[in-house]
Amino acid sequence: MGEAAGDRVLSRLHSVRERIGDSLSAHPNELVAVFTRLVNLGKGMLQAHQIIAEYNNAISEADREKLKDGAFEDVLRSAQEGIVISPWVALAIRPRPGVWEYVRVNVSELAVELLTVPEYLQFKEQLVEEGTNNNFVLELDFEPFNASFPRPSLSKSIGNGVQFLNRHLSSKLFHDKESMYPLLNFLRAHNYKGMTMMLNDRIRSLSALQGALRKAEEHLSGLSADTPYSEFHHRFQELGLEKGWGDCAKRSQETIHLLLDLLEAPDPSTLEKFLGTIPMVFNVVIMSPHGYFAQANVLGYPDTGGQVVYILDQVRAMENEMLLRIKQQGLNITPRILIVTRLLPDATGTTCGQRLEKVLGTEHTHILRVPFRTENGIVRKWISRFEVWPYLETFTDDVAHEIAGELQANPDLIIGNYSDGNLVACLLAHKMGVTHCTIAHALEKTKYPNSDLYWKKFEDHYHFSCQFTTDLIAMNHADFIITSTFQEIAGNKDTVGQYESHMAFTMPGLYRVVHGIDVFDPKFNIVSPGADMSIYFPYSESRKRLTSLHPEIEELLYSEVDNNEHKFMLKDRNKPIIFSMARLDRVKNLTGLVELYGRNPRLQELVNLVVVCGDHGNPSKDKEEQAEFKKMFDLIEQYNLNGHIRWISAQMNRVRNGELYRYICDTKGAFVQPAFYEAFGLTVVESMTCGLPTFATAYGGPAEIIVNGVSGFHIDPYQGDKASALLVEFFEKCQEDPSHWTKISQGGLQRIEEKYTWKLYSERLMTLTGVYGFWKYVSNLERRETRRYLEMLYALKYRTMASTVPLAVEGEPSNK
């Protein structure tokens, strides 16, 4: 149900209970049939599609038309999950993103109850803890800490937090002269390693500041626009102004105008421009502990994929933006960016055992590796991202020491990546008092259905008790949160967002989250990344094409040799290629792609299939990858796909991968991303940037990247036959009309140009750091209560749970 439809339903009746009650009284026979079918499914959880399926089976189409008049179908279609404990059926109803209501229906008595969040969660817990006393359960509720701060209420405001925050700051903090003093103090506090910036001690009041600014403005008006700062810095110092206003007269004048305008008549746009202009970011630390973090020969290793690519592209763009801004601010400061990850002493063939490594394409950015350590010494083995929790506290202390040695100062911004990186970033930012940004990449709770309710079943392998607690701590501690898409935050009209799934949930026997996060919180900002344009560019740019790599690519795709690089063969080289490349894990669902291909003989007639994943020459020690590896072989044998499929080991060479995308374009093929859930979808952006028509999962970020039918296609990984039929339809249409392939290819390229570039990303990130850094400064006391609450959760829950995760047993050194 869309937002407009949701508003229509909400305005029609005042509450869920009244809407359902009205339908019950108007159509009791039909509704009894629906809920009786739900009860007959037996005790357990219901997914949204099950609820709708039973509704469609129970009620004829004619009767469903009648029910629409009573609004019951709208309500039922907005139910995201159900709980059956006879004779009760409880529903979690989501009229629109970020808005939830809970109801319980007694099928025997046709009684309807509206439930509070704790009541609904308590009822849910009965599925796993029948007969236990759950009246005294730890409930986590972060809502009181934010009660005094206004929130936007429209779904379209989600992910545009900085705009709302700017409006709030400009209206509340600057409504009179006294309220502007935090800005004055903020500017006076600016310094870098003892070097004063912006204002010196001569300016102690707002009137003195305004007077100095007007005199500086008058002085600058008599100079040519390109007069360097060095020629008027003495006059500035006499007035109380220090470095940082600009590198020349013109830029200094622009900054002064912004501040004068802000002091005279504050408005959100001027505030954002000013805070984005002043010098605030010189040292950045980016945390990404797990996996194999290096610049070559690691992609495709366990826990090593899009996040590594994202960060390496991110830091190159960030360094360029920092250098540009520092120059424009008239400062002679060398910025530093440190990517902090785990040192792996035995990762042969990679640089993962090297303490410090310069990032290629940068001047001032390095990978800093710090080992995991226990009382027995350095941990040498690779450790799954699900098992890092016992090491992170000691790791954080060691990282703090290493950062201090490298930077000789505190960082100005700490960015966490994924759950483990976000926890370390949170602990460091808390300790150092610096601005903290969170980037989740993927929140595991949404990948594994009901992994909160049945967490004990997952605990031995995944340790979700640690991970979900870590995620709650990090997202509530962060000064601002970056997501690549709206869907990451709040999903869409049909699916729940990653962060939204943390609003309310229960882990029976551990704690109950009645308010974990608010997706309307202005800390959320959508900042979409791009692809590296030097590697990923359109297939049509023939002068840039790396044709010298084509013999290697053709060997990779078509050689008849079976080896550790590639298995199985393609008999017909003239057919287009369906291509996919990802980690070999359950959620990425590459085995699902092979299965849908195997089940559709017509698709096999039309196209070949090439999948790039896993490592034939070095079997993984990751249990999930081992299972998917076996499943892949079994499916290829079951459907007799040899001759139609090529299974290539994970490819580490990004430059060649870029040309591989373009080579697939030459075959008039397509890229398919079949994940059950994908937070963003970097490979989707890469393939579209190369001009390759792309089919990608409807669950997560790709549904936002692709405009369905215009710049690519959405597929449902849970409905493989429909996905394969869509592929057949596309390739049959391309056979009839080759311009159809070109049309979709061009649509993808246009979408990328409009929305997904690293330059736009880095500009936005630097501006966000300025705005939220200022907000952190002026609201520090208000956030103290939240931080104390988080300290308690960390000390009393997380540390206890982390201590139960088994430590790695050191054996023979391993690369994977």
UniProtKB/Swiss-Prot annotation:
EC number(s) from the headed UniProt entry: 2.4.1.13
Keywords: Glycosyltransferase, Transferase
Any GO molecular function: sucrose synthase activity
Tissue occurrence: Expressed in root phloem and leaf mesophyll. Expressed in phloem tissues and aleurone layers of seeds and at lower levels in the pericarp and endosperm cells (at protein level). Predominantly expressed in elongating tissues including roots, developing leaves and internodes.
Induction and repression of expression: Up-regulated by sucrose, fructose and glucose. Up-regulated under elevated CO2 condition.
A biological-process GO annotation: response to carbon dioxide
Region (GT-B glycosyltransferase): 280-757
Catalytic activity: an NDP-alpha-D-glucose + D-fructose = a ribonucleoside 5'-diphosphate + sucrose + H(+)
Superkingdom classification of source: Eukaryota
Gene3D superfamilies, per the entry: 1.20.120.1230, 3.10.450.330, Glycogen Phosphorylase B
Subunit field text: Homotetramer or heterotetramer with SUS2.
Family designation: Belongs to the glycosyltransferase 1 family. Plant sucrose synthase subfamily.
PANTHER family named among the record's database cross-references: PTHR45839, SUCROSE SYNTHASE 1
Function: Sucrose-cleaving enzyme that provides UDP-glucose and fructose for various metabolic pathways.
Entry protein name: Sucrose synthase 1
Name of the encoding gene: SUS1
